C-alpha cells in the first residue's frame, strides 16, 4: 500500500502544479482514465488472496475519490477564475455617457388633423372614414355633380376606369353615412384625397376634413356659429371671419369662409396678397337633392356641411409658405414641430 500512497501523493502534487483545465484533464487521464495508473492498480486485485481483496479494494477506491475530489475542486477554481476574467473583460461601464437617441414627434399634418378632430368630437361629432378608391356615383353623382362638371375631367381626377377613381374629397363618406344612418347625424370625415394638381400651394395628394350635421330645424346660423367657434379655437385668436357667397353643387346656399390674415393681422402682406383676408374653407346648407338621393326627406330634415384642407390650415398656423415642404421628409424641417 506504500506504492498506492506514493501514487496518490504524485497525483495530488500534479494537480497542484497544473496551470489550466487542459493540464488537469491530462492528469485525470493519467491517473483515473481507462489505462490510468490507479485504474491499473485496481486491476491487480485479482492477484490477491480473496480475504484481502475487500480491504485493498476499499483503499484503492478511497484513493481514487481523494484524487477525483481534488481534481474537481481545482477545476472549479480554474472555471471561476476564467469566468471572472471574461466578465471583467466584457463589463460595461454604466457611468459612460450614452449614445443618445433622437426623439421623434408627430408630423405637423397629423397634429393639425388631431387638433381639428379634438374640437369637433368635444362638441359631439363622431369620426367617420371611408374608402380612398371610390366609385363615380358616391364621388360625383350622389353629390349633385352633373356629368358636364369640370371636376369630372381627366385632368382633375385620377381615374382607374370609367367608374372607379381616387376620391377627390371626403364627401363620399358623408353620402355613405347618410345612406346607412338615420338622422340626427353629426360627423367629421378626415382622410387623404387626390387631385391632378401640383404646385407651391397644391399637392396631388392632400388631407381634407369635411363635416356634416343633419337634424331638424337646422339653419345657416347654426353653421356660422360652428365655423366661427372652430376657427377661434384652432388659431387661438379672436380673428375676424367673413362668409362670401359661393357655389358648390352639393350645398345651397354656399359660402367661402375667410379669416383675417394671421400673418399681418389684416394689414396686408404677401401671404394675403395685400387683401388682409385668407380663404380657409368652404361650406353651405346641404342641397335637397343630396338628401333625397341618400334617402333623407329634405322637408323634414335639414343640414349643413363644410370642408377644409388640413395642409392649408397647417400652413397658416405654422407659417409655412410651401405646401411641398410637408412631404419632402426633410428632418430639419419636421424637427421644428416636435
Swiss-Prot record:
Swiss-Prot/TrEMBL keywords: Aminoacyl-tRNA synthetase, ATP-binding, Cytoplasm, Ligase, Magnesium, Metal-binding, Nucleotide-binding, Protein biosynthesis
Subcellular location field: Cytoplasm
GO biological process: phenylalanyl-tRNA aminoacylation
Pfam families hit by this protein: Phe_tRNA-synt_N, tRNA-synt_2d
Catalytic activity reported: tRNA(Phe) + L-phenylalanine + ATP = L-phenylalanyl-tRNA(Phe) + AMP + diphosphate + H(+)
UniProt-listed InterPro entries: aa-tRNA-synth_II, aa-tRNA-synth_II/BPL/LPL, Phe-tRNA-synth_IIc_asu, Phe-tRNA_ligase_II_N, Phe_tRNA_ligase_alpha1_bac, Phenylalanyl-tRNA_Synthase, tRNA-bd_arm
One CC-aspect GO term: cytoplasm
Any one GO molecular function term: phenylalanine-tRNA ligase activity
CDD domains in the record: PheRS_alpha_core
Cofactor, how bound (note): Binds 2 magnesium ions per tetramer.
Binding site for Mg(2+): 252
Domain of life of the source: Bacteria
Main location per the UniProt record: cytoplasm
EC number(s) from the headed UniProt entry: 6.1.1.20
Quaternary structure and interacting proteins, as annotated: Tetramer of two alpha and two beta subunits.
UniProt-listed NCBIfam families: pheS
Family: Belongs to the class-II aminoacyl-tRNA synthetase family. Phe-tRNA synthetase alpha subunit type 1 subfamily.
Record-linked PANTHER family: PHENYLALANINE--TRNA LIGASE, MITOCHONDRIAL (PTHR11538:SF41), PHENYLALANYL-TRNA SYNTHETASE (PTHR11538)
Protein name: Phenylalanine--tRNA ligase alpha subunit
Amino acid at each position: 500500500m506504500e506504492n498506492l500512497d506514493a501514487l496518490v501523493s504524485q497525483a495530488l502534487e500534479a494537480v497542484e502544479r497544473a496551470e489550466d483545465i487542459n493540464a488537469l484533464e491530462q492528469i485525470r487521464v493519467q491517473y483515473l482514465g481507462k489505462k490510468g495508473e490507479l485504474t491499473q492498480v485496481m486491476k491487480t486485485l485479482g492477484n490477491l488472496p480473496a480475504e484481502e481483496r475487500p480491504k485493498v479494494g476499499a483503499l484503492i477506491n478511497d484513493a481514487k475519490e481523494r484524487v477525483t475530489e481534488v481534481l474537481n475542486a481545482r477545476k472549479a477554481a480554474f472555471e471561476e477564475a476564467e469566468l471572472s476574467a471574461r466578465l471583467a473583460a466584457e463589463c460595461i461601464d454604466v457611468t459612460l455617457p450614452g449614445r443618445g437617441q433622437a426623439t421623434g414627434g408627430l408630423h405637423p399634418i397629423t397634429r393639425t388633423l388631431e387638433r381639428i378632430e379634438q374640437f369637433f368630437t368635444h362638441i359631439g361629432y363622431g369620426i367617420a372614414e371611408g374608402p380612398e378608391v371610390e366609385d363615380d356615383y358616391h364621388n360625383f353623382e350622389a353629390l349633385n355633380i352633373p356629368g358636364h362638371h369640370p371636376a369630372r375631367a381627366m385632368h382633375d381626377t385620377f381615374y382607374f376606369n370609367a367608374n372607379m377613381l381616387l376620391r377627390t374629397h371626403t364627401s363620399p363618406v358623408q353620402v355613405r353615412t347618410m345612406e346607412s344612418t338615420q338622422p340626427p347625424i353629426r360627423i367629421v370625415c378626415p382622410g387623404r384625397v387626390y387631385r391632378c394638381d401640383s404646385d407651391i400651394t397644391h399637392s396631388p395628394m392632400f388631407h381634407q376634413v369635411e363635416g356634416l350635421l343633419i337634424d331638424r330645424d337646422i339653419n345657416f346660423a347654426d353653421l356660422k356659429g360652428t365655423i366661427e367657434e372652430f376657427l377661434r379655437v384652432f388659431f387661438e385668436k379672436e380673428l375676424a371671419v367673413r362668409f362670401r357667397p359661393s357655389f358648390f353643387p352639393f350645398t345651397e346656399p354656399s359660402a367661402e369662409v375667410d379669416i383675417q390674415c394671421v400673418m399681418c393681422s389684416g394689414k396686408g402682406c404677401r401671404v394675403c396678397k395685400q387683401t388682409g383676408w385668407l380663404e380657409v374653407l368652404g361650406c353651405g346648407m346641404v342641397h335637397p337633392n343630396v338628401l333625397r338621393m341618400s334617402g333623407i326627406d329634405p322637408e323634414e330634415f335639414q343640414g349643413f356641411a363644410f370642408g377644409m384642407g388640413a395642409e392649408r390650415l397647417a400652413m397658416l398656423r405654422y407659417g409655412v409658405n410651401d405646401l411641398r415642404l410637408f412631404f419632402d421628409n426633410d428632418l430639419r424641417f419636421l424637427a421644428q414641430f416636435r
